């Protein structure tokens, strides 16, 4: 995730010319017709053509406004985004800023699209609506100069000075930039270890997990590269040639890729199968070590845990980047279950258990009065009390505009926060319990009051040291148990076809599965459940899907749900088991 401009400006090293005040592009309702290009005609589709590069991506035009998913803006155009107020967003691209309140966010199948016409046209992007893929065109910018310097703080900054704004695509550790560069400039980039290559007007650079920032006056693209992650290091072994995989396959690991039919369409099904009691791989949750807010690439999540194989995990809010479901690690709830949705729970070296899961929690005062807790370390907000711990991150900042709370340490209330005092954030130390009240609920306690926490899981799997939530639950004990309404999913979600990620079991082996449509959108949940039962599975849990669907094998993302390596919140990984003493 790109750093906020204010933070970047504080980093030492190459000075950044202080940018002028950001331009603010008007929202659709604020636009004035004089001088504007002709309104776009109504339509929708599944493909974009970005400076000639064809990319599968959902789009919609309504009332002259182009709506694009957040993943497309970030991964295919280079737009930065950050939270703004309660459920709002701020989009920023080469000095233009667009504020998008929650009312301006919509649903496009399983994507979150936002209005983009003003932002794109403010920087010269031509939008042409015609039959077939929707073209987005921005003339390639000239690369004027390259500057580089070690920053301290474990970063090296590379600044690309440009003659104009440029499109920026990202994925699998590389950036593709719509810029024109000279052979001498490419040699300079090679010296910096960025492995430049120029193809059809796109300059490709290997940047690893670099943070990026676009600026105006003058036009610049800033890359902060983590030191120690050398972009030009030897390429990771390809899956088919990785000796680690070959050794594990000899011990029973299976990797399959096949075309199957379901619901009248062909599906590309990738599966990983193993007996965790025999194959020396451990199933682990994958998450960001910095806390529960934020997204990462699946490849990055896998690498930091040294997972040889990984799939994307549970649901999250793409706007505020917070978790929406259960995730438990080493007996700690990093994020609690919601809506009695499906989950798996497991211990090392065993097959997971599958069930629907909820937590029943309450706090009790010295007079034995109890107050129910609605959620634990969750981005799913509702009226009532919620609790947060240091597993949420080093700080908690109010998610809604009306919150108050108390910090409990050692069973005693230490500090009270009135309405509004959580907006700027409060620290969370190890052992702290922050109880937050929302939606008019009250926290009646004062410093010194004694409180105790009571917690009970609705299913034995909630007592397992490791839990991953998703939903809906598809199969249990050999039966199709799909009941999306009981798990809080909408009818539209249940009926749509989409790429899928599933974790399952045939009673002997663990299965990690992705399903994609060959020439269609993908299977419905019912089609997924039926197909997996036909393949011999007895238990199966649907995880986050759509553009989130991904499979990483040996540091290579071999499956991308809609053709883009989308950022995700968490995942499931298979990590080589360490040999005993």
Residue spans of the language-model regions?
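Sec-dependent N-terminal signal peptides
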Residues: 1-11
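Gly/Ser/Thr/Pro-rich low-complexity, intrinsically disordered segments
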Residues: 10-56, 61, 65, 75-103, ...
